[in-house]
Amino acid sequence: MREYLPDTKFVHSSNGHDLRLWDDQRRNSFVDLIKDSTVFINASKIYQLGQLQLLNLAYETAIEHNIQNYTVINIGSTAEFDPTQFEMYSIEKNALKERSRQLASKGFRSSHITIGNLDHVKGIGKTIKLVLEHDPFLSMVKIEH
Protein backbone atom coordinates (compact mmCIF):
# COMPACT_ATOMS: atom_id res chain seq x y z
CA MET A 1 0.00 0.00 0.00
CA ARG A 2 2.78 2.45 0.92
CA GLU A 3 4.33 1.97 -2.51
CA TYR A 4 1.33 3.67 -4.13
CA LEU A 5 0.23 5.88 -1.23
CA PRO A 6 3.42 6.86 0.64
CA ASP A 7 1.79 9.58 2.77
CA THR A 8 -0.85 7.26 4.19
CA LYS A 9 -1.38 7.20 7.96
CA PHE A 10 -2.58 3.77 9.03
CA VAL A 11 -5.09 3.68 11.87
CA HIS A 12 -5.73 0.37 13.62
CA SER A 13 -5.89 -1.17 17.09
CA SER A 14 -2.19 -2.12 17.18
CA ASN A 15 -1.21 1.55 17.00
CA GLY A 16 -3.71 2.71 19.60
CA HIS A 17 -6.86 3.42 17.58
CA ASP A 18 -10.12 1.62 18.28
CA LEU A 19 -12.53 2.22 15.40
CA ARG A 20 -15.47 0.50 17.06
CA LEU A 21 -17.70 3.53 17.55
CA TRP A 22 -19.29 2.23 20.73
CA ASP A 23 -18.91 5.34 22.89
CA ASP A 24 -18.46 9.11 22.61
CA GLN A 25 -14.71 8.99 23.22
CA ARG A 26 -14.15 6.67 20.25
CA ARG A 27 -16.53 8.64 18.05
CA ASN A 28 -14.82 11.93 18.92
CA SER A 29 -11.40 10.44 18.28
CA PHE A 30 -12.55 9.27 14.84
CA VAL A 31 -14.09 12.67 14.06
CA ASP A 32 -10.72 14.29 14.86
CA LEU A 33 -8.97 11.87 12.48
CA ILE A 34 -11.42 12.78 9.71
CA LYS A 35 -10.98 16.51 10.30
CA ASP A 36 -7.19 16.10 10.03
CA SER A 37 -7.25 14.15 6.76
CA THR A 38 -8.48 14.36 3.17
CA VAL A 39 -9.12 10.66 2.50
CA PHE A 40 -10.39 7.81 4.64
CA ILE A 41 -9.76 4.26 3.43
CA ASN A 42 -12.54 2.28 5.08
CA ALA A 43 -11.05 -1.21 5.32
CA SER A 44 -11.64 -2.24 8.92
CA LYS A 45 -13.45 -5.50 9.55
CA ILE A 46 -15.75 -4.53 12.39
CA TYR A 47 -18.86 -6.64 12.87
CA GLN A 48 -22.33 -5.21 13.46
CA LEU A 49 -22.09 -2.82 10.49
CA GLY A 50 -18.89 -1.19 11.74
CA GLN A 51 -17.70 -0.13 8.28
CA LEU A 52 -21.10 1.39 7.55
CA GLN A 53 -20.97 3.36 10.81
CA LEU A 54 -17.50 4.64 9.90
CA LEU A 55 -18.70 5.73 6.45
CA ASN A 56 -21.70 7.54 7.91
CA LEU A 57 -19.64 9.35 10.55
CA ALA A 58 -16.97 10.34 8.00
CA TYR A 59 -19.72 11.74 5.76
CA GLU A 60 -21.45 13.59 8.62
CA THR A 61 -18.13 15.05 9.77
CA ALA A 62 -17.13 16.22 6.30
CA ILE A 63 -20.52 17.88 5.78
CA GLU A 64 -20.70 19.43 9.26
CA HIS A 65 -17.18 20.88 9.01
CA ASN A 66 -17.50 21.83 5.34
CA ILE A 67 -14.48 19.75 4.31
CA GLN A 68 -14.37 20.17 0.53
CA ASN A 69 -13.67 17.14 -1.67
CA TYR A 70 -13.32 14.75 1.26
CA THR A 71 -13.02 11.20 -0.08
CA VAL A 72 -13.97 7.86 1.44
CA ILE A 73 -12.72 4.67 -0.20
CA ASN A 74 -14.75 1.69 1.02
CA ILE A 75 -13.17 -1.74 0.62
CA GLY A 76 -15.80 -4.29 -0.28
CA SER A 77 -15.56 -8.04 -0.68
CA THR A 78 -16.55 -10.68 -3.19
CA ALA A 79 -18.70 -11.97 -0.31
CA GLU A 80 -21.17 -9.34 -1.56
CA PHE A 81 -22.03 -11.75 -4.37
CA ASP A 82 -22.45 -14.93 -2.29
CA PRO A 83 -24.95 -14.36 0.53
CA THR A 84 -25.60 -18.08 0.93
CA GLN A 85 -22.02 -18.79 1.95
CA PHE A 86 -21.17 -15.55 3.76
CA GLU A 87 -24.56 -14.70 5.29
CA MET A 88 -24.27 -11.68 7.63
CA TYR A 89 -20.87 -10.61 6.29
CA SER A 90 -22.41 -10.44 2.80
CA ILE A 91 -25.31 -8.35 4.13
CA GLU A 92 -22.92 -5.94 5.86
CA LYS A 93 -20.76 -5.50 2.74
CA ASN A 94 -23.83 -4.96 0.56
CA ALA A 95 -25.17 -2.36 3.00
CA LEU A 96 -21.81 -0.57 2.81
CA LYS A 97 -21.88 -0.69 -1.00
CA GLU A 98 -25.43 0.67 -1.17
CA ARG A 99 -24.75 3.50 1.29
CA SER A 100 -21.60 4.44 -0.61
CA ARG A 101 -23.66 4.55 -3.81
CA GLN A 102 -26.30 6.74 -2.13
CA LEU A 103 -23.72 9.24 -0.89
CA ALA A 104 -21.97 9.32 -4.27
CA SER A 105 -25.30 10.11 -5.94
CA LYS A 106 -25.52 13.18 -3.64
CA GLY A 107 -22.13 14.37 -4.90
CA PHE A 108 -20.07 13.11 -1.96
CA ARG A 109 -16.79 11.46 -2.97
CA SER A 110 -17.50 7.93 -1.75
CA SER A 111 -16.15 4.99 -3.72
CA HIS A 112 -16.77 1.29 -3.20
CA ILE A 113 -14.03 -1.05 -4.38
CA THR A 114 -14.47 -4.80 -4.73
CA ILE A 115 -11.40 -6.76 -5.78
CA GLY A 116 -11.65 -10.50 -6.31
CA ASN A 117 -8.99 -13.19 -6.28
CA LEU A 118 -6.33 -10.85 -4.96
CA ASP A 119 -3.01 -12.49 -4.15
CA HIS A 120 -1.13 -9.35 -3.09
CA VAL A 121 -2.26 -6.39 -0.99
CA LYS A 122 -0.34 -4.08 -3.31
CA GLY A 123 -3.20 -4.48 -5.81
CA ILE A 124 -5.48 -2.67 -3.37
CA GLY A 125 -3.08 0.27 -3.07
CA LYS A 126 -2.76 0.49 -6.84
CA THR A 127 -6.54 0.48 -7.25
CA ILE A 128 -7.06 3.13 -4.55
CA LYS A 129 -4.48 5.36 -6.22
CA LEU A 130 -6.30 4.91 -9.54
CA VAL A 131 -9.62 5.95 -7.95
CA LEU A 132 -8.09 8.99 -6.23
CA GLU A 133 -6.45 10.23 -9.43
CA HIS A 134 -9.23 9.44 -11.89
CA ASP A 135 -11.34 12.23 -13.36
CA PRO A 136 -14.26 11.83 -13.33
CA PHE A 137 -14.44 10.29 -9.87
CA LEU A 138 -15.06 6.53 -9.82
CA SER A 139 -17.80 5.76 -7.30
CA MET A 140 -17.84 2.00 -7.91
CA VAL A 141 -15.01 -0.30 -8.96
CA LYS A 142 -15.10 -4.08 -9.34
CA ILE A 143 -11.95 -5.88 -10.41
CA GLU A 144 -11.46 -9.60 -10.93
CA HIS A 145 -7.86 -10.79 -11.09
Feature roles, as predicted:
Residues 1-11:
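Canonical Rossmann dinucleotide-binding motif of NAD(H)/NADP(H)-dependent dehydrogenases/reductases
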Residues 10-28, 40-41, 45-46:
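Rossmann-fold cofactor-recognition segment
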Residues 24-35, 57:
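Conserved amphipathic alpha-helix within the SDR
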Residues 32, 45-70, 105:
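Amphipathic alpha-helical dimer-interface segment in Rossmann-like NAD(P)H-dependent oxidoreductases
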Residues 38-39, 71:
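Structural motif
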Residues 39-50, 76-79:
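Conserved NAD(P)H cofactor-binding loop of Rossmann-fold oxidoreductase domains
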Residues 63-64, 69-106, 114-122:
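Catalytic loop of short-chain dehydrogenase/reductase
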Residues 118-145:
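C-terminal helical subdomain
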